[in-house]
Amino acid sequence: MCRVCFCLYFRLKKKAMENEFGYERICRCALNLALGYKPAIAAALIDHLGSAADVMKLDREELEDILGPFSVEDKLTDRDGLLEKAEKELREAARYGAVFLHAGDAAYPALLRECEDAPIGFYCRSCSAPEEIFARRPFISIVGTRDISLYGREWCERLVSSLSSVSPAPCVVSGLALGTDVCAHLRALDLGLPTIAVMATGIDSIYPAQHRNYAMRIASTPGCALISDYPCGTAPLKNNFIRRNRIIAGLSSATLLIESKIKGGGMMTARLAFSYDREVYALPGRIDDLRSQGCNYLIKGNMAEAVTDCGSFLDSLGLTRGREGFRECRERRMEAVLDGKLAGSSEDVATILLLVKRNRGIDLDELVRRSGLEYKRVSALVTALEEEGIIGIDLLRRCRIL
């Protein structure tokens, strides 16, 4: 095709594509498909030429003049096929209520943009506009092991609860995985805090599958979102989890590691946050607990600040407690319970609360034995206290004060 014919064809193609999504967005999506694993190269090309649309005009020879010989991805030279694929990708994402947000958008997260390996763009699935989700508010990433202990779960919930006492309300960022991630997401949702789940799959699928209901709850809650820089249809491959950790670390001004082995995914996220010059916090644990080895290692190496209580954690983050404190809120709810406003006599409730407070992890059978109350009565009280957010219950029906 001659140069004149190509230019005419290119203009017609561009005009046709501009109508639905905007040509620059389609070009950015195309670059993400071709260079998603090398975002720094895409960013350099855009900076050099001024726009993704200008990048898509180049042929192989022109690209090699900029990047050097033998450095051009074959996918990048098939412009027509790549642009058509990108347009289909945007339509597919839209079917799931997702938009493609790129670094040229005003709503693209400012802290993420600072990272040298920031994604070219990412898909955002939410009932809110990106401008609302990534508005000027604190973002705190909370990560850790999938095999979270009762101690880790309790402190994860406490620390998220403490975030609910500050204003403006921070956004809790995590990865939707088992254990620590989902604990942080659910506690945030229960307290009305915004939360973002960064996924290692396409925006059209949820991993793990048992978290689908949680993911849909996040996507349908105002101010919350599911995000991914992977195209639709991407499977949950191991390397995808490693790469998505950079987004979890990059979105936030601080990362909190709850529990992790020395080589856990949470450790990787914490190290990335440290490399981005962000604040890193870690929950110290027993020296003989494998799940705390990563946290203790970071603290010992001065890569992370030890979290010893909720108040100092908030102070270190520089967050102002502008709303009712979580501790005061919990005490007020307990007073309401003890006044007989919840499920029966205050004396029985006080007995249950005292036993749970003194015996962290006590199960229902032991509560029945020690309280002298009937099983049905104990079960009803515990359920009511859980609904009030005063105690937490795990899958084994073990109880703890929140």
Task: Describe the function of each predicted region.
Residues 16-22, 102-402:
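Glycine-biased, small-residue-rich flexible motifs in mid-sequence functional cores and linkers
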